[in-house]
Amino acid sequence: MEYLDILNNINEEDQEIKLKPHDRVLIIDGLNLFFRNFATINLTNNNGAHIGGLGGFLRSMGTLINKVQPTSIYVIFDGKGSTVNRNNINPDYKANRNINRITNWDSFDSLEDEHESKLDQLQRLVQYLKLLPIKILSFDKAEADDIISVLCNQLSYDKNKLFIVS
């Protein structure tokens, strides 16, 4: 399974935005928070498998919820083909990104093992997030930051307090 397959499993139903004036809205760039935790938290489960991305994301989200006390939470993921538009404008967009290991410890024997763990954790994260009372948004050909921008413009008119984590 690849990253885009995981995102395709995000239900696009029930993504209507229903807020009341003065709501406190927490908006999280899902991949950004996931990758930061995956790369920096060397957390393993009882079987010795790396779960830093998953565990770190959930721990970070819990901390954010305690601090912000949101009435609504949105986790935004890059959509399928999200870099296409920017690559059309600038062919060098993200061109310098190499496929390298992003962790600096020995939890993985190879780049392939790290990649497999990353996809497994991301898939489980999306499954867990679907069980929570939050909205998960991902739209084809749109990057998370673009979706967040549109969402903020849409939500700000009712004097909602918006908290963005990216």
Language-model features: where?
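Catalytic core of IPPT-family isopentenyl/dimethylallyl transferases
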Residues: 12-13
